[in-house]
Amino acid sequence: MTHQDRLHSPALPDGSPFDLDNPAAYPAWREARLAAAPRTLDHLIVEIGDPRHLTEAEHAAILKRCARANMAIYVSTAGEDPDKSIPARLGERFGLCRLDHNRGADEDAITSLMVKDDARHRGYIPYTDRPIAWHTDGYYNDAEHQIHGLILHCVRPAEQGGDNALLDPEIAYIRVRDQGPDLIRALMHPECMTIPANPRELGGDQGGQGHPRPDRPGPVFSVAQDGHLHMRYTDRSRSIRWRDDPLTAAAVACLKSVLREPSPWRFQARLESGWGLICNNVLHTRTAFADGTAPRLLYRARYYDRIRGI
């Protein structure tokens, strides 16, 4: 690692499993992480009553799954209740409070995800019925506004499609690092992945300051101040610029291969009415979908916080 790279790297806590220059802690962390990781979708699911009023047992069950997989799927009795306090109150219970006022969000910073063709949303794929490739949310945000927590709450599913594939970023990290620590080093470079400037996004991701969003370079993998692994990624091929060197190219190819290949830790889920995903911004996709009489509606809440307690 060059001196310049070190200037851009976070100060890692002693004994961090993510310290490539002092890897002693990594093998034990890797073994424990893989041993704890669920291998079936059923192990992510928690049945609950009202998400706005979790019992202590429901809270503990969700937290346990998030500790093992950085995510949980709740199956609630809320049905098609359109109350936006459902994701808001649920998030607060897990320490998710600092909402990201992104460009497409509603006034309360919770986004109503459905097919929209107005000028504000036109051209942005989340508001279409098209498939969305692997990504973490808010990958275009600046370093001070990274998305660490995410809730997706389903009010109405599509008539067909709209499924999500899910993968814990820590599992993706392990599978790439197994192929060589230098690949991880490339993915942790501060200029590994750049999202080019977008003059259409005034103020972009944090509520709008009246300025076009500039280039946003940053790493794919980084370590947050609390010592947790953080991932920033999109599998799209347009509107993205990778660092131009052979090691980065090899690292990106390895990561894309990990995302393409089936594995015991990759899950496929379809959120039904009253169901939701609460997570530490895990990797996810969305299949194409077709609406019926009532359009698909999900609420998306993005947070600058991680889930508290894990």
Model-derived segments and their meaning:
Residues 74-81, 154-158:
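Short, flexible beta-strand-to-coil junctions
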Residues 91-100:
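A short alpha->loop->secondary-structure connector
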Residues 69-78, 87:
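N-terminal, charged low-complexity regulatory/assembly segments
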Residues 56-61:
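Polybasic, low-complexity association/targeting segments
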Residues 2-54, 65, 106, 111-270, ...:
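Active-site environment of non-heme Fe oxygenases that use a 2-His-1-carboxylate facial triad
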